[in-house]
Curated annotation (Swiss-Prot):
Record gene name: scyl1
Start-end of Low complexity biased regions: 615-624
Sequence ranges assigned to domain Protein kinase in this UniProt record: 16-309
Domain of life the protein comes from: Eukaryota
Native source species: Xenopus laevis
Basic and acidic residues: compositionally biased ranges: 629-638, 757-766, 792-814
Name of the protein in its database record: N-terminal kinase-like protein
Phylogenetic classification of the source organism: Eukaryota, Metazoa, Chordata, Craniata, Vertebrata
Family per record: Belongs to the protein kinase superfamily.
Length: 827
């Protein structure tokens, strides 16, 4: 019947593909895959031929042995099939060691680290067979070793295996395998030997072949060739003529693991730790992952992808490794292609962003440039951005700073609402209310860099107001950033805005107490004046100069030449601003030493005069800018030599500029009054520097190194009477920063706040009417919502009123004599 004549190989659940590679003993190896799932496998095939009964019996022995032997260093059996014509053995996907070495020749060959771990695995497999299984492999050579995709060596070739003490039952080897026989097999006088002697001789042959290629004849073992020096003494023991001196496999491992031994290196140590990682203590895992990133550069790429990466993912998924897995994770991610990255790394990254661990959040923000290109827009807007924005309101300044800088990378992938609404609200609050000067400066910097991605309506509403506010910031680099912001985004302003809004603001900056800020203001003013003169001389060029004003999406290269004031990658600006934290009277640390990462506390007032501000950027992208002066371009960069002192000045009340909102109409007289007041305050030379962001020492600059024209640092003026803090001055930490304030007060703004809290002011910060940065809706409420609620304000007013009534009653009781209506008795 046809049923009985059907070929059983048709039901074989694996497809055999690829070319057949011949192996000793009649075997061949081919690549294959499972028919249902497509999982890759290796298929060993043996064709049964008449007249080769001994070889066929050895092949069947190998098929039986591989099914029963389970060990990490022995070839893993998956499936098999035996017919009258052929034998099939399906294993994990592997490559013969000889083929693997040839493939690696073009890339520099197999490194000693790989060889050390590979031999370590083969010796462990022999130790298992001899000491635990009481079995003799009897075929250890290069053709019996296979390499998996992670670069790990597996022992195969079980054709000639036999039980220890039953040597007579072993199948006879082929002629091509006789060169691996130990000398005692032919010399009957050397009958005294250990059970492992033959396998250890073959191990010596394997070592010779790994370093020197296929063994031509047994006498070639006397020549060391390229064998590693640290392995030579142990190799000589293996190929010694006396079988009694050949060590046990476990003893051989111990000898090579001793200090200075061939198996004593970071690669072997890493692998041994990974094998036992499930039973390691959390502290040991923490230390291991911290040191792993440094060693990855010397490890094979395949090993990192297929061995270490799964362990990192498992450690994050089920362990408590935390943020320490991120550096090695992203380092290995560079070895993956786009599909592998999307499949393995991105799901973990998305999950990490929802973590409440601050260390993990800041590490993610710092490493974002490594994986941002693999994130698609729906993932960024739906799963990442909602978690990232929480960093804008974090109490840790380092997280706020990193969150701001990460927007440089996220902005191109944000949708309309997240970019033009949510992000701008957070930027408005940070620039107006954050107590860290570097963070306010970084916010201005970032806004200028992402300006091309904003829609035209948002740009017209936000940019002028934001940069105008920055020019009145007490932190000098913030003022410089505001001036440079105007220069970098000059093509987004109409000629009417340039003349009516931008130039009046820049003219006010020409009286800035810092020379570098003034110089940049003059250069930027000349740039805008050149544009206006061009239009005045040739009105037909107006359309060309305003072509980007209403462009929906400008190219990011528009602001790419902003004199390096910010860079595409994420780095820290704060570390440039903050060098020392003590005052002049304190013993300051050495210049350039990074501040320790600690929580920032409000420092007490001191009498240190305000140091000079860092240089401002020297170029603008405008084609109308005149040539820079040679003196500015030739000066040396003094940023690292500046002693920035404490970032909180002695006189907060005088140096703090009025907190006007970004929705201010620059044509109104009240704004001009504010500008005059700000200029007059600055002209006295009183500045406020905010507390240093000590945690920013984690980074190394946000591209400001070449940003500003550098000039020699100004000499510190001697402390004069005008620079001493007035009596009764309080530090910034004593003020209620969340309370609404007034704009038109002179003197100590905060100490008189309670007396005027019930009065309505013209300042938009306290206005109840809806507004925004440019005069539209929803922006005023952003900052107003950050303060006290109406119920709390009303309650405070009642309490203050009650205190006033009680004080008057106490005064009347203390008065002498009777009081008449409308008359106050004088003492």
């Amino acid at each position: 019947m046809w049923f009985w004549s059907r070929d059983p190989a048709r039901d074989f659940p694996y497809d055999v593909t690829g070319e057949r590679e011949e192996l000793p003993g009649g075997w061949g190896i081919q690549k294959g895959k499972k028919k249902t799932g497509g999982d890759p496998v290796s298929v060993f095939t043996y064709e049964i031929r008449p007249g080769a009964e001994e070889q066929t019996q050895a092949a069947k022995t190998a098929s039986k042995r591989i099914k029963t032997l389970k060990h990490p260093n022995i070839l893993s059996y998956v499936d098999g099939l035996e017919t009258d014509k052929c034998l099939y053995i399906v294993t994990e996907p592997v490559t013969p060691l000889e083929t693997y070495v040839k493939l690696r020749t073009d890339s520099g060959g197999v490194s000693e680290l790989e060889i050390s771990w590979g031999l370590h695995q083969i010796v462990k497999a022999l130790s298992f067979l001899v000491n635990d299984g009481n079995l003799i492999h009897n075929n250890v050579c290069m053709s019996a070793v296979f390499v998996d995709r992670a670069g790990e060596w597996k022992l195969g070739g079980l054709d000639y295996m036999y039980t220890a003490g039953a040597e007579n039952t072993a199948p006879r080897k082929g002629v091509e395998m006789e060169k691996y026989n130990p000398p005692e097999k032919t010399d009957r006088s050397k009958t005294s030997k250990e059970k492992w002697s033959a396998d250890m001789w073959c191990l010596g042959c394997l070592i010779w072949e790994v370093f020197n290629g296929p063994l031509p004849r047994p006498t070639a073992l006397r020549s060391l060739g390229k064998i590693a020096k640290s392995l030579v003494p142990h190799y000589c023991e293996l190929v010694g003529a006396n079988p009694k001196i050949r060590p046990n496999p476990s003893r051989f491992l111990q000898n090579c693991r001793s200090p200075g031994g061939f198996f004593c290196n970071s690669f072997v140590e890493t692998n041994l730790f990974l094998e036992e990682i499930q039973i390691k203590d959390p502290a040991e895992k923490q230390t291991f992952f911290e040191q792993l990133s440094e060693n990855l550069d010397s490890f094979p790429e395949d090993f990192c992808r297929h061995k270490i990466l799964p362990q990192l993912l498992t450690a994050f998924e089920f362990g408590s490794a935390g943020a320490v897995v991120l550096p090695p994770l992203f380092k290995i991610g560079k070895f993956l292609n786009a599909d592998e990255y999307q499949q393995k790394i991105i799901p973990v990254v998305v999950k990490m962003f929802s973590s409440t661990d601050r260390a993990m959040r800041i590490r993610l923000l710092q490493q974002m440039e490594n994986f941002i290109q693999y994130l698609n827009e729906p993932t960024v807007n739906a799963q990442i951005f909602p978690h990232v924005v929480h960093g804008f309101m974090d109490t840790n300044p380092a997280i706020r700073e990193q969150t701001v800088k990460s927007m440089l990378l996220l902005a191109p992938k944000l949708n309309e609402n997240n970019l033009n609404m949510d992000l701008m609200k957070h930027f408005a609050r940070l620039q107006a209310r954050d107590d860290q000067g570097p963070i306010r400066c970084n916010t201005t910097v970032c806004l200028g860099k992402i300006a091309p991605y904003l829609n035209p309506a948002t740009r017209q509403r936000v940019l002028i107001s934001a940069f105008s506010r920055a020019t009145k910031d007490p932190f000098a680099p913030s003022r410089a950033a505001g001036v440079l912001g105007f220069a970098a985004t000059h093509n987004f302003y109409s000629m009417a805005d340039c003349a009516g809004k931008v130039l009046p603001v820049l003219c006010g900056v020409t009286l800035d107490p810092e020379k570098n800020v003034r110089e940049q203001a003059f250069k930027t003013i000349r740039s805008f004046l050149d544009k206006l003169e061009t239009v005045s001389g040739d009105p037909s060029q107006l359309a060309e100069l305003e072509k980007d004003v209403h462009t929906a999406s400008a190219s990011p290269s528009v602001v790419g030449g902003w004199a390096g004031w910010a860079v595409t990658g994420v780095s820290s600006l704060t570390s440039k601003f903050i060098r020392t934290g003590g005052g002049a009277q304190d013993a300051s640390p050495s210049e350039g030493a990074p501040a320790p990462p600690a929580t920032i506390e409000a420092s007490k007032p001191d009498t240190v005069p305000s140091p000079s501000a860092p240089p401002a950027a020297s170029t603008t992208p405008s084609s109308y800018e005149p040539e820079e002066e040679k003196g500015a371009s030739d000066s040396l960069d003094r940023w690292d030599d500046e002693d920035w002192g404490s970032l909180e000045d002695t006189d907060q009340s005088k140096g703090q500029t009025v907190n006007d909102d970004w929705d201010t109409d620059w044509g109104q007289s009240k704004t001009q009054q504010k500008t005059v007041h700000s200029s007059s305050s600055s002209s006295k030379g009183e500045q406020v520097l905010h507390p240093p962001n000590k945690t920013s020492a984690l980074d190394d600059g946000w591209g400001w190194d070449d940003a500003f024209p550098t000039v020699p640092p100004a000499k510190k003026p001697t402390a004069s009477k005008s620079q001493q803090p007035e009596e009764g001055t309080r530090p910034a930490s004593d003020y209620n920063w969340e309370s609404p304030g007034t704009a038109g007060q002179q003197g100590d703004f905060f100490t008189t706040l309670s007396e005027h809290s019930s009065q309505k002011t013209d300042d938009s910060r306290n206005s109840d009417s809806p507004g925004d940065w440019g005069g539209e809706d929803n922006w005023e409420s952003v900052e107003a919502d950050q303060g006290l609620s109406k119920a709390e304000i009303a309650r405070k007013k009642r309490e203050e009123r009650q205190k006033e009534i009680e004080a008057k009653r106490a005064e009347r009781r203390a008065a002498k004599g009777p009081l008449k209506l409308g008359v106050r008795k004088l003492d």
